[in-house]
UniProtKB/Swiss-Prot annotation:
Tagged with keyword Protein biosynthesis: no
Lineage of the species this protein comes from: Bacteria, Bacillati, Bacillota, Bacilli, Bacillales
Classification via SMART domains: Ribosomal_S15
Domain of life: Bacteria
UniProt name for this protein: Small ribosomal subunit protein uS15
Gene name tied to this protein: rpsO
Keyword field: Ribonucleoprotein, Ribosomal protein, RNA-binding, rRNA-binding
Pfam families: Ribosomal_S15 (PF00312)
Organism name: Geobacillus sp. (strain WCH70)
A molecular function GO annotation: rRNA binding
Role of this protein: One of the primary rRNA binding proteins, it binds directly to 16S rRNA where it helps nucleate assembly of the platform of the 30S subunit by binding and bridging several RNA helices of the 16S rRNA.
Assigned GO CC terms: cytosolic small ribosomal subunit
């Protein structure tokens, strides 16, 4: 369920703003989105795994807060990220 280091590096390379960027909202949202997608696949198979479902809800809430922050901070970056990730909003 956890992301491999290689996959995390790929996501960081794809969404980074500058050379040493690992913590910008875009990178954090992209990593959370990947984790959420993986957990969704897990929960489709294991429907009664309520502990993982709670973790999923926490991740979705954290991503929502980061998206709200980015929307308030820079709407252009927000719209670009939404289109790249294919999120509804």
């Amino acid at each position: 369920m956890a992301l491999s280091q290689e996959r995390k590096r790929e996501i960081i390379e794809q969404f980074k703003i500058h050379e040493n960027d690992t913590g910008s909202p875009e990178v954090q949202i992209a990593i959370l989105t990947e984790q959420i997608n993986n957990l969704n696949e897990h929960l489709r198979v294991h429907k009664k795994d309520h502990h993982s479902r709670r973790g999923l809800l926490k991740m979705v809430g954290k991503r929502r807060n980061l998206l709200t922050y980015l929307r308030n901070k820079d709407i252009a970056r927000y719209r670009e990220l939404i289109n790249k990730l294919g999120l509804r909003r």
